[in-house]
Amino acid sequence: MEYLVVYFDDDRGVIVNSAPGAWMTNQILMLEAGTYYIELAPPADHTPPQIPIQLVDTTVDDPYEINFIKNAS
């Protein structure tokens, strides 16, 4: 099992490989090792639109971390 945290200013759904699920930003996500394309649920008010990652060799205490930045309004 691998661990990922997707940071964003707001709580938002996280889309993994184009599949929405029960994942949320700012929480630890548990996924199998592998390559993933991470996006946020709408609205599209952030950059980048998608982040590709290779998830391997993580622990719950040292998860892979990515950040989406909210666009200026």
Regions found by a protein language model. Name each.
Residues M1-S73:
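Short loop/turn and low-complexity linker motifs enriched in small/turn-promoting residues
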